[in-house]
Each structure stands twice: as C-alpha cells, then as structure tokens.
Amino acid sequence: MTKATPKYADDTVYQISVDKVVTLAREKGATPILITPLARRKFDHGQLLDTHGLYSQAVRALAERENVGLIDLNRDSMDWLRALGEAPSRDFFMHVPAQNQTDDTHLQHRGAVAVACLVVAGWKQLDAGLQEYVVRDTDCGARGTALSDRTT
C-alpha cells in the first residue's frame, strides 16, 4: 500500500475554490461563514510560525470582498498555541511516542475539543444571539486573557 501523494493548491486556486462554495451556499439559501485554517504547531526557537499565511490571507480577502462572516481560526489558534507554549501544546496534537508518531497538524481529542471551542467563540462574535445556546465556557484553556486581550 502506498501513501497518497499530498495535494496542494496555490492560494489563488484555493480562493477560487472557496469562492465557488460561497456562491453555491448562497444559491441554496444558506448563509456562508468562512474559517481560516487551523494553525500548525510549528515552533522555531520558541516562536510559533505561521505556516498558512497565503491561505489565510486568501480567505480573509474573500470574506471581505464577498461580505461573508469570517472566523479567523488561524489567528485564534496561533494565539491559543502561544498562550499554551511550545511544550504544553504538544499534548493537544498527535504525538504518540509509543508509535514513534509526531504530528503537529492533526489533533488528539482534547485538541479537537479546544479548537471547536475557538470556533464557537468566533461564531459568537459573528452572532451575539448564539450566546443563549452556548452551554460551555469558550476560553479554550488559554492562560490569562490571551484571546480577549488581542490588539489586532
């Protein structure tokens, strides 16, 4: 069995593809909400690197151009990972020493729950009326007020 070849689209093709989804959603009467990619856990000398720059920028530009709600998961998850720190954030990703597995892209269950929490927090910012339906705190375990103190 061979591993599938990774498939990538440059940011222009990616934006065109996402734009098609927005158009289709609107044609079907849905209200689209765009979400930038989840940050990868990639640190260099203690600094978290943005590995999705052009993709995230493409989604942000499309959301602005098409007047579509945006949850900036890339920004929020980078804030979250910085707040956790390099070593503690490892526990949220697929690091399985017994299987010699180190995966800083895919999440363990607790990481998936935390990221879902970030998405809900972003959704609540888009629609304050959702607050009454949210039954779980959405600080996502970040220390202090890392998410609410953001300046940008």
Where does each model-flagged region fall?
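Anion (oxyanion) recognition and catalysis
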Residues: D19, R26, R60-E64
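Generic anion/oxyanion-binding catalytic loop in active/binding sites
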Residues: K3, V21, Q101
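Catalytic His-Asp segment of secreted/periplasmic serine-dependent ester chemistry enzymes
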Residues: P37-T152
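Oxyanion-hole/transition-state-stabilizing segment in secreted/luminal serine hydrolases
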Residues: M1-V13, R40
